[in-house]
Amino acid sequence: MTKGIIAAAVVMLVASASSAAPYRPSDDATVLVTVPPAAASTQTAFRTAQNALAANPNDLDLALEVARAAIRDGRASADPRRYGQAQAALAPWWSIPNPPMSVRVLRAIVRQSLHDFAGAEADLEAILRLDPRNGQARLTRAFVRQTVGSLADAKDDCRRLPPSVGALAAAVCWLRVQALTGSAASALERLDQVIKIYGKVDPLVLRWAQAVGADMAAMLGQTEAADLHFSEATTDGGDIPTLVAFADHLLDSNRPAEVLTLLAGRSEADIVYLRLAIAGKRLDDARAPHWTALLADRFAAANAGGVQLHLREEARFELEVRGDAATALKLALANWKIQKEPSDARLVLQTALAANDPAAAADVLAFIEKTGLADTRIKPLQDKIAEKKS
């Protein structure tokens, strides 16, 4: 059971990079990335299952199999079409008030991927009312709550996780909340200990724990420790959100050339192209104008279509690539209303400073004070805003 639980949980997390809306190709035939033979074999099996489900759409077990596979692939590739495939697989039960619990958990995950956090939490709450010891729902809700900044509630969910989730998964849940509330040093120390004890149980759980550890180390300004954790989290090549989080760490460490190497040929998702564009601009790479124009077109198309899942990425694009601080601040504040990860807080502070509008950061500063968040990537920004106010 643990693998299924963790597969659901990692969709929710991994350094928050996956919260942004990736590239949405207009044609399913569009090639996002060339896959190795093993992945191609998996995709063939997925299409076979899809075809079988098309012939018998009310087969619940088959629908769950297809939906779970689609979600796993969406998580790994940052391809939003996979979440659409998951929703399509669950179509007979999608709109009914009380679907089977297994459907409800997957519906919550898809809703979370679309930033419908309230809808996701409603589904998970309904499950936990009937089955308080449902580990998958409890763990998933804990990370939804972390994303929206409900840290006390997230801590409560982590505390109430049943043994079925496994010791390492439970530790990651609890320790990440500790890190987000001012205790990153002790949380990372404990996480490293737990990884040594339980890290051989499940490779998927271990990679997830390493990615969380990398973010904790980065919060503490421990560059080498973050490098090590990211390297461990990507030993098998890594999924796209984890690679993007690694790229952000490299950018923070002023290593843009390594970003271009890390992400070369990995995906055509927006979250990848954004990091390439930022790194390319810093290096004056000849490809940077192409990446910039491509992202500008995609964001314009998304806005024209009423899609607002890409606010964090678009804000960074406006700030770090285009240099439009006013637009970036507007987007960052809109994003802050939806999600409240450390990267979201940091973005508001960065854009407020760049736009010379420190007052715009008031809500974020209040949130930081309330939660006790201590992050070396954020503290200098707090200090600069305090200087401007004085």
Across the structure, where does each feature detected by a protein language model lie?
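Canonical positions in the second alpha-helix
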Residues: 52, 92-93, 126-127, 160-161, ...
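Residue-level detector of the short coil/turn that links helix A to helix B
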Residues: 81, 115, 149, 182, ...
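Canonical tetratricopeptide repeat
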Residues: 65, 106, 140, 173-174, ...
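Short coil turns that delineate tetratricopeptide repeat
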Residues: 57, 98, 132, 165-166, ...
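Residue-level recognition of tetratricopeptide repeat
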Residues: 68, 75, 109, 143, ...
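N-terminal leader/linker segments that initiate helical-solenoid repeat arrays
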Residues: 18-102, 113, 387
